[in-house]
Amino acid sequence: MVVLGSTGSIGTNSLEIARKFNIEVEALACAENVKKLNAQIAEFHPKFVYIKDEKLKSKVAHNKIFSGENGICEMLNRCESKTVINALVGFAGLIPSLKIQNSGKILCLSNKESLVVGGKFLDTSKIRAIDSEHFGLKFLLENSAKPAKMIITASGGAFYKTPIKDLSSKKAADALKHPNWNMGAKITIDSATMANKLFEMLEAFWLYGCKNLDALIEPSSSVHALIEFIDGSTAAHLSRTDMKLAIAHAILPNLKSEILKPVDLLSLNLKFEKIDIKKYPIFELKDEVLSNPDLGVIINAANEIAVFAFLQGKCGFLDISSTIFKAVEKFNDLTPENAEDLIKIDKIVRNFARSELRL
Protein backbone atom coordinates (compact mmCIF):
# COMPACT_ATOMS: atom_id res chain seq x y z
CA MET A 1 0.00 0.00 0.00
CA VAL A 2 0.91 3.69 -0.25
CA VAL A 3 0.59 6.07 2.72
CA LEU A 4 0.26 9.79 2.02
CA GLY A 5 0.75 11.76 5.22
CA SER A 6 2.73 8.95 6.82
CA THR A 7 4.20 10.96 9.70
CA GLY A 8 0.86 12.29 10.98
CA SER A 9 -1.54 10.61 13.39
CA ILE A 10 -3.50 8.64 10.77
CA GLY A 11 -0.37 7.77 8.81
CA THR A 12 1.41 6.50 11.92
CA ASN A 13 -1.59 4.36 12.89
CA SER A 14 -1.84 3.05 9.32
CA LEU A 15 1.74 1.86 9.50
CA GLU A 16 0.97 0.13 12.80
CA ILE A 17 -1.72 -1.84 10.94
CA ALA A 18 0.78 -2.57 8.14
CA ARG A 19 3.22 -3.87 10.75
CA LYS A 20 0.58 -6.02 12.47
CA PHE A 21 -0.61 -7.66 9.24
CA ASN A 22 2.70 -7.69 7.33
CA ILE A 23 1.42 -5.40 4.56
CA GLU A 24 4.09 -4.19 2.12
CA VAL A 25 4.47 -0.41 2.07
CA GLU A 26 5.44 0.73 -1.43
CA ALA A 27 5.59 4.48 -0.86
CA LEU A 28 5.51 7.09 1.91
CA ALA A 29 4.80 10.81 1.74
CA CYS A 30 5.05 13.61 4.29
CA ALA A 31 5.39 17.38 4.47
CA GLU A 32 8.53 18.03 6.51
CA ASN A 33 9.07 15.59 9.39
CA VAL A 34 12.33 14.17 8.05
CA LYS A 35 13.34 12.44 11.29
CA LYS A 36 10.14 10.42 11.50
CA LEU A 37 10.11 9.74 7.74
CA ASN A 38 13.65 8.35 7.89
CA ALA A 39 12.67 6.05 10.76
CA GLN A 40 9.73 4.80 8.69
CA ILE A 41 11.99 4.28 5.68
CA ALA A 42 14.38 2.21 7.81
CA GLU A 43 11.56 -0.05 9.00
CA PHE A 44 9.30 -0.41 5.95
CA HIS A 45 11.80 -0.04 3.06
CA PRO A 46 9.47 1.74 0.59
CA LYS A 47 10.39 1.92 -3.11
CA PHE A 48 9.51 5.62 -3.27
CA VAL A 49 9.21 8.54 -0.87
CA TYR A 50 7.88 12.07 -1.14
CA ILE A 51 8.71 15.15 0.91
CA LYS A 52 6.91 18.40 0.21
CA ASP A 53 9.84 20.77 0.74
CA GLU A 54 12.48 20.28 -1.97
CA LYS A 55 15.11 21.79 0.32
CA LEU A 56 14.78 18.78 2.63
CA LYS A 57 15.46 16.12 -0.04
CA SER A 58 19.14 15.88 0.85
CA LYS A 59 18.22 14.90 4.42
CA VAL A 60 15.93 12.02 3.39
CA ALA A 61 17.59 8.59 3.58
CA HIS A 62 16.41 7.30 0.20
CA ASN A 63 17.49 7.35 -3.45
CA LYS A 64 14.05 7.69 -5.09
CA ILE A 65 12.62 10.90 -3.69
CA PHE A 66 9.81 13.02 -5.10
CA SER A 67 9.02 16.56 -3.96
CA GLY A 68 7.29 19.78 -4.92
CA GLU A 69 3.75 20.61 -5.97
CA ASN A 70 3.34 17.77 -8.48
CA GLY A 71 5.61 15.28 -6.76
CA ILE A 72 2.89 13.18 -5.12
CA CYS A 73 1.05 12.63 -8.41
CA GLU A 74 4.35 11.81 -10.13
CA MET A 75 5.10 9.27 -7.39
CA LEU A 76 1.62 7.74 -7.66
CA ASN A 77 2.23 7.22 -11.39
CA ARG A 78 5.15 4.96 -10.47
CA CYS A 79 3.33 3.02 -7.76
CA GLU A 80 1.78 -0.39 -8.47
CA SER A 81 -0.08 -0.72 -5.16
CA LYS A 82 -3.86 -0.96 -5.44
CA THR A 83 -4.48 0.64 -2.03
CA VAL A 84 -3.60 4.25 -1.21
CA ILE A 85 -4.24 5.93 2.14
CA ASN A 86 -4.73 9.67 1.76
CA ALA A 87 -4.04 11.14 5.19
CA LEU A 88 -2.83 14.50 3.92
CA VAL A 89 -4.04 17.65 5.69
CA GLY A 90 -6.31 20.21 4.05
CA PHE A 91 -7.03 21.20 0.46
CA ALA A 92 -3.67 19.73 -0.57
CA GLY A 93 -5.26 16.27 -0.40
CA LEU A 94 -7.83 16.93 -3.15
CA ILE A 95 -5.72 16.50 -6.30
CA PRO A 96 -4.10 13.27 -4.99
CA SER A 97 -7.59 11.89 -4.23
CA LEU A 98 -8.72 12.61 -7.79
CA LYS A 99 -5.49 11.10 -9.13
CA ILE A 100 -5.90 7.94 -7.04
CA GLN A 101 -9.43 7.36 -8.30
CA ASN A 102 -8.63 8.20 -11.91
CA SER A 103 -5.83 5.60 -11.86
CA GLY A 104 -8.22 2.89 -10.65
CA LYS A 105 -6.64 2.52 -7.21
CA ILE A 106 -8.59 2.04 -3.97
CA LEU A 107 -8.85 5.35 -2.10
CA CYS A 108 -8.77 4.96 1.68
CA LEU A 109 -9.67 8.50 2.60
CA SER A 110 -8.80 10.30 5.80
CA ASN A 111 -8.40 13.67 4.06
CA LYS A 112 -11.95 14.91 4.67
CA GLU A 113 -11.33 18.10 2.70
CA SER A 114 -11.36 16.02 -0.51
CA LEU A 115 -15.06 15.31 0.06
CA VAL A 116 -15.90 18.65 1.65
CA VAL A 117 -14.48 20.53 -1.33
CA GLY A 118 -14.80 18.12 -4.25
CA GLY A 119 -17.28 15.43 -3.27
CA LYS A 120 -19.26 15.78 -6.50
CA PHE A 121 -16.13 15.05 -8.55
CA LEU A 122 -15.28 11.82 -6.69
CA ASP A 123 -16.84 8.37 -7.04
CA THR A 124 -17.90 8.11 -3.42
CA SER A 125 -19.19 4.56 -3.90
CA LYS A 126 -15.57 3.43 -4.19
CA ILE A 127 -14.15 5.38 -1.26
CA ARG A 128 -13.22 3.63 1.98
CA ALA A 129 -13.60 6.38 4.57
CA ILE A 130 -11.11 6.51 7.43
CA ASP A 131 -13.11 8.33 10.08
CA SER A 132 -14.63 6.92 13.23
CA GLU A 133 -18.03 8.50 12.51
CA HIS A 134 -18.30 7.37 8.90
CA PHE A 135 -16.97 3.92 9.68
CA GLY A 136 -19.66 3.76 12.35
CA LEU A 137 -22.37 4.75 9.85
CA LYS A 138 -21.12 2.19 7.32
CA PHE A 139 -21.04 -0.51 9.99
CA LEU A 140 -24.63 0.27 11.01
CA LEU A 141 -25.87 0.40 7.42
CA GLU A 142 -24.63 -3.07 6.50
CA ASN A 143 -27.51 -5.56 6.32
CA SER A 144 -29.92 -2.94 7.67
CA ALA A 145 -33.18 -1.45 6.51
CA LYS A 146 -33.26 1.94 4.80
CA PRO A 147 -32.34 4.67 7.31
CA ALA A 148 -34.63 7.57 8.14
CA LYS A 149 -31.93 9.69 9.77
CA MET A 150 -28.19 9.56 10.40
CA ILE A 151 -26.56 11.09 13.47
CA ILE A 152 -22.87 11.52 14.21
CA THR A 153 -21.40 12.62 17.52
CA ALA A 154 -18.97 15.28 18.70
CA SER A 155 -16.94 15.46 21.87
CA GLY A 156 -17.39 19.21 22.11
CA GLY A 157 -13.65 19.73 21.69
CA ALA A 158 -11.22 21.43 24.03
CA PHE A 159 -13.71 24.17 25.00
CA TYR A 160 -16.72 21.97 25.74
CA LYS A 161 -16.74 23.09 29.40
CA THR A 162 -15.53 26.64 28.72
CA PRO A 163 -18.06 29.47 29.27
CA ILE A 164 -18.94 31.33 26.07
CA LYS A 165 -17.73 34.63 27.56
CA ASP A 166 -14.20 33.20 27.89
CA LEU A 167 -13.79 31.94 24.30
CA SER A 168 -12.46 35.22 22.89
CA SER A 169 -9.39 35.06 25.14
CA LYS A 170 -8.43 31.45 24.38
CA LYS A 171 -5.09 30.75 22.71
CA ALA A 172 -3.93 27.97 20.41
CA ALA A 173 -2.28 26.08 23.28
CA ASP A 174 -5.65 25.91 25.04
CA ALA A 175 -7.51 24.73 21.93
CA LEU A 176 -4.99 21.95 21.25
CA LYS A 177 -5.85 20.13 24.49
CA HIS A 178 -8.46 17.71 23.11
CA PRO A 179 -10.13 15.74 25.92
CA ASN A 180 -10.36 12.37 24.12
CA TRP A 181 -8.44 12.13 20.84
CA ASN A 182 -4.77 12.47 19.96
CA MET A 183 -4.88 14.27 16.62
CA GLY A 184 -2.98 16.77 14.50
CA ALA A 185 -3.12 20.50 15.25
CA LYS A 186 -5.56 21.56 12.52
CA ILE A 187 -8.21 18.92 13.17
CA THR A 188 -7.97 19.58 16.92
CA ILE A 189 -8.78 23.26 16.32
CA ASP A 190 -11.56 22.22 13.92
CA SER A 191 -12.96 20.09 16.73
CA ALA A 192 -12.96 23.06 19.09
CA THR A 193 -14.86 25.26 16.60
CA MET A 194 -17.14 22.40 15.41
CA ALA A 195 -15.93 22.93 11.82
CA ASN A 196 -14.80 19.31 11.92
CA LYS A 197 -18.35 18.12 12.58
CA LEU A 198 -19.71 20.35 9.81
CA PHE A 199 -17.18 18.78 7.45
CA GLU A 200 -18.08 15.27 8.60
CA MET A 201 -21.75 15.90 7.90
CA LEU A 202 -20.88 16.95 4.36
CA GLU A 203 -18.72 13.84 4.06
CA ALA A 204 -21.65 11.68 5.20
CA PHE A 205 -23.87 13.35 2.60
CA TRP A 206 -21.45 12.47 -0.20
CA LEU A 207 -20.70 8.98 1.08
CA TYR A 208 -24.24 7.84 1.87
CA GLY A 209 -26.54 10.22 -0.02
CA CYS A 210 -28.53 11.14 3.08
CA LYS A 211 -29.57 14.74 3.76
CA ASN A 212 -31.40 14.01 7.00
CA LEU A 213 -28.24 14.37 9.04
CA ASP A 214 -27.56 15.73 12.48
CA ALA A 215 -24.83 15.76 15.11
CA LEU A 216 -24.99 15.59 18.89
CA ILE A 217 -22.38 16.10 21.57
CA GLU A 218 -21.44 12.88 23.38
CA PRO A 219 -18.57 13.96 25.65
CA SER A 220 -16.89 10.57 26.14
CA SER A 221 -16.49 9.89 22.38
CA SER A 222 -17.60 6.30 22.98
CA VAL A 223 -20.59 6.51 20.61
CA HIS A 224 -19.42 7.51 17.13
CA ALA A 225 -22.59 7.23 15.05
CA LEU A 226 -26.29 6.45 15.31
CA ILE A 227 -28.95 5.64 12.74
CA GLU A 228 -32.67 6.08 13.24
CA PHE A 229 -34.73 3.69 11.12
CA ILE A 230 -38.20 4.16 9.69
CA ASP A 231 -39.71 1.66 12.14
CA GLY A 232 -38.64 3.81 15.11
CA SER A 233 -35.62 1.75 16.16
CA THR A 234 -32.19 3.32 16.65
CA ALA A 235 -28.79 1.64 16.29
CA ALA A 236 -25.54 2.99 17.69
CA HIS A 237 -21.89 2.20 17.01
CA LEU A 238 -19.51 2.23 19.99
CA SER A 239 -15.76 1.72 20.14
CA ARG A 240 -12.73 3.01 21.96
CA THR A 241 -11.18 6.31 20.83
CA ASP A 242 -8.58 4.78 18.54
CA MET A 243 -8.48 5.34 14.77
CA LYS A 244 -6.81 1.99 14.11
CA LEU A 245 -10.23 0.34 13.90
CA ALA A 246 -11.43 2.51 11.00
CA ILE A 247 -8.02 2.30 9.33
CA ALA A 248 -7.87 -1.50 9.56
CA HIS A 249 -11.33 -1.92 8.03
CA ALA A 250 -10.42 0.45 5.18
CA ILE A 251 -7.23 -1.45 4.37
CA LEU A 252 -8.61 -4.94 5.09
CA PRO A 253 -12.37 -4.98 4.32
CA ASN A 254 -12.77 -8.66 5.31
CA LEU A 255 -11.03 -8.16 8.64
CA LYS A 256 -11.79 -10.76 11.32
CA SER A 257 -8.96 -10.05 13.80
CA GLU A 258 -9.12 -8.09 17.03
CA ILE A 259 -7.93 -4.51 16.58
CA LEU A 260 -9.20 -2.95 19.81
CA LYS A 261 -10.52 -4.20 23.12
CA PRO A 262 -14.31 -3.78 23.37
CA VAL A 263 -15.75 -0.79 25.18
CA ASP A 264 -16.22 -1.43 28.90
CA LEU A 265 -19.99 -0.97 29.05
CA LEU A 266 -20.05 -0.95 32.84
CA SER A 267 -17.80 2.10 32.98
CA LEU A 268 -19.81 4.17 30.49
CA ASN A 269 -21.65 7.29 31.54
CA LEU A 270 -23.39 8.30 28.34
CA LYS A 271 -25.23 11.53 27.75
CA PHE A 272 -26.17 13.39 24.59
CA GLU A 273 -26.54 17.14 24.15
CA LYS A 274 -27.60 19.49 21.37
CA ILE A 275 -24.80 21.53 19.84
CA ASP A 276 -25.09 25.08 21.19
CA ILE A 277 -24.96 27.51 18.26
CA LYS A 278 -23.90 30.34 20.57
CA LYS A 279 -20.82 28.37 21.58
CA TYR A 280 -20.20 26.75 18.19
CA PRO A 281 -21.52 29.32 15.66
CA ILE A 282 -20.01 27.51 12.66
CA PHE A 283 -22.54 24.71 13.14
CA GLU A 284 -25.29 27.17 12.19
CA LEU A 285 -24.19 26.57 8.58
CA LYS A 286 -25.26 22.90 8.74
CA ASP A 287 -28.55 23.16 6.85
CA GLU A 288 -27.18 25.65 4.33
CA VAL A 289 -24.18 23.50 3.43
CA LEU A 290 -26.28 20.32 3.14
CA SER A 291 -28.67 22.09 0.76
CA ASN A 292 -25.76 23.62 -1.18
CA PRO A 293 -22.70 21.35 -0.88
CA ASP A 294 -20.73 23.63 -3.24
CA LEU A 295 -20.19 25.85 -0.20
CA GLY A 296 -17.68 23.28 1.03
CA VAL A 297 -14.80 24.76 -0.97
CA ILE A 298 -15.55 28.26 0.39
CA ILE A 299 -15.87 27.18 4.01
CA ASN A 300 -12.76 25.02 3.83
CA ALA A 301 -10.55 27.71 2.27
CA ALA A 302 -11.57 30.37 4.79
CA ASN A 303 -11.23 27.88 7.64
CA GLU A 304 -7.72 26.77 6.67
CA ILE A 305 -6.44 30.35 6.50
CA ALA A 306 -8.08 31.33 9.80
CA VAL A 307 -7.03 28.17 11.67
CA PHE A 308 -3.38 28.48 10.70
CA ALA A 309 -3.46 32.19 11.57
CA PHE A 310 -4.85 31.27 14.99
CA LEU A 311 -2.18 28.60 15.48
CA GLN A 312 0.45 31.25 14.74
CA GLY A 313 -1.11 33.71 17.19
CA LYS A 314 -2.17 36.11 14.41
CA CYS A 315 -5.91 36.10 15.13
CA GLY A 316 -8.33 35.24 17.92
CA PHE A 317 -10.30 32.03 18.32
CA LEU A 318 -13.63 33.66 17.44
CA ASP A 319 -12.08 35.17 14.29
CA ILE A 320 -12.15 31.69 12.76
CA SER A 321 -15.94 31.50 12.63
CA SER A 322 -16.42 35.16 11.69
CA THR A 323 -14.03 34.79 8.74
CA ILE A 324 -15.95 31.76 7.51
CA PHE A 325 -19.30 33.56 7.71
CA LYS A 326 -17.92 36.55 5.79
CA ALA A 327 -16.55 34.27 3.07
CA VAL A 328 -19.83 32.37 2.72
CA GLU A 329 -21.77 35.63 2.48
CA LYS A 330 -19.48 37.02 -0.23
CA PHE A 331 -18.94 33.92 -2.37
CA ASN A 332 -22.07 31.77 -1.92
CA ASP A 333 -23.01 32.13 -5.59
CA LEU A 334 -19.83 30.49 -6.89
CA THR A 335 -20.43 27.05 -8.39
CA PRO A 336 -17.47 24.86 -9.39
CA GLU A 337 -17.99 22.88 -12.60
CA ASN A 338 -14.70 20.97 -12.49
CA ALA A 339 -11.56 20.47 -10.42
CA GLU A 340 -9.90 23.51 -12.02
CA ASP A 341 -12.76 25.68 -10.75
CA LEU A 342 -12.19 24.32 -7.24
CA ILE A 343 -8.57 25.45 -7.34
CA LYS A 344 -9.55 28.93 -8.59
CA ILE A 345 -12.29 29.39 -5.98
CA ASP A 346 -10.01 28.11 -3.24
CA LYS A 347 -7.39 30.70 -4.18
CA ILE A 348 -9.93 33.57 -4.34
CA VAL A 349 -11.38 32.73 -0.93
CA ARG A 350 -7.96 32.30 0.67
CA ASN A 351 -6.92 35.75 -0.53
CA PHE A 352 -10.17 37.20 0.84
CA ALA A 353 -9.64 35.52 4.22
CA ARG A 354 -6.06 36.80 4.43
CA SER A 355 -7.33 40.30 3.71
CA GLU A 356 -10.06 40.06 6.35
CA LEU A 357 -7.54 38.85 8.93
CA ARG A 358 -4.95 41.41 7.78
CA LEU A 359 -2.30 38.76 7.28
Swiss-Prot record:
InterPro entries: DXP_reductoisomerase, DXP_reductoisomerase_C, DXP_reductoisomerase_N, DXPR_C, DXPR_C_sf, NAD(P)-bd_dom_sf. It catalyses: 2-C-methyl-D-erythritol 4-phosphate + NADP(+) = 1-deoxy-D-xylulose 5-phosphate + NADPH + H(+). Pathway: Isoprenoid biosynthesis; isopentenyl diphosphate biosynthesis via DXP pathway; isopentenyl diphosphate from 1-deoxy-D-xylulose 5-phosphate: step 1/6. Mn(2+) binds at D131, E133, E200. Its EC number is 1.1.1.267. It comes from the Bacteria. The keyword Manganese applies. The keyword Membrane does not apply. Keywords: Isoprene biosynthesis, Manganese, Metal-binding, NADP, Oxidoreductase. 1-deoxy-D-xylulose 5-phosphate binds at K112, S132, E133, S155, H178, S191, N196, K197, E200. One of its GO terms (molecular function) is NADPH binding. Catalyzes the NADPH-dependent rearrangement and reduction of 1-deoxy-D-xylulose-5-phosphate (DXP) to 2-C-methyl-D-erythritol 4-phosphate (MEP). Belongs to the DXR family. NCBIfam families: Dxr. This is 1-deoxy-D-xylulose 5-phosphate reductoisomerase. The gene is dxr.
